[in-house]
């Protein structure tokens, strides 16, 4: 049975220390979700980069790059917001924890973004299988075969 909460989030750049980490929020509440981290309402224009301070419980979490993708131009076929944070484990963890405390979003499980893309007609089953093979490729020949 599918989860009733349609808006999902997850780190899409991998885990661990990095200069930049990307957290993706995808679904009907994506814009409303990110707005909760802004001190003032901000109009997000599709595919325009915005530099914003992110706030939670009156504390500044980070200064981040925020990019909005309308559903017709996103990977998932859903309204999507990408948040490019500093890649500190503490910063990313605090942002993920804050997102997890909201009622209209849930943390994505493995393959949830691709499932959205498939359900919204953005990918065919053969593309989903090919992507899974590419992600799991351990050798160059497996990578080539997955393509």
Segments and roles (model prediction):
Residues 1-147:
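A glycine-rich (often HGG/GG-containing) alpha/beta subdomain
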